[in-house]
């Protein structure tokens, strides 16, 4: 009976790192530096699950390094996400007028950072610093303003039907079969929300917000 080969330190993270390496080799990508990313939700107050996502990503980075590869953890703030709802305990700040706006364009209600989104991200970054996780911080706002993803966005839009079908196949989400995987930033918009219990239609004017585009 042959012994099963132990990868790295024998953990599931080591196995994941090994599978990642095999995938990158098959795709012919450079292995000079392998970036691992953890998204930082910037629309709400971070919690233990938010920290857990970053810790697991950091574990993959360490496993890759243990296998002899250089790796970096990117802590990526999704600060172009729209504010979906008011976080519990923050009702007093009058954030209702900012619902739907990218959180990077909402003023920080505490006045300590350049935006609401940066304030929320900073809370999680402080946690990463305290537990000794090394990372490179990036923001969606800067990434898009600098046009760093324009080629990737073009490719995604060209293949939106294929991508929508694959998302539906893998996770059962059918939204992107009807809508483009793209959120348009608009200066002015109107939101129609049907109130089923009252059988009424609520109409709100929105400014500097993001909307989905139907195919």
Which sequence ranges carry the predicted segments?
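Non-catalytic terminal extensions that flank enzyme cores
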Residues: 1-48, 59-75, 90, 95-100, ...
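The substrate-binding groove and active-site-proximal loops of carbohydrate-active enzymes
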Residues: 4-7, 42-51, 103-115, 145
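A short acidic (Asp/Glu
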Residues: 45-49, 83-88, 148-149
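Short secondary-structure capping/junction motifs at helix and strand boundaries
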Residues: 70-71, 108-111, 122, 129-140, ...
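Acidic carboxylate-rich catalytic motifs and surrounding loops in phosphoryl-/glycosyl-chemistry enzymes
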Residues: 75-78, 136-148
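Charged, often glycine-rich, active-site loop that binds/positions anionic groups
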Residues: 80-97, 152-154
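A glycine-rich helix N-cap at a beta->alpha junction
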Residues: 94-131
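Feature captures the FAD/FMN-dependent oxidoreductase FAD-binding
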Residues: 146-157
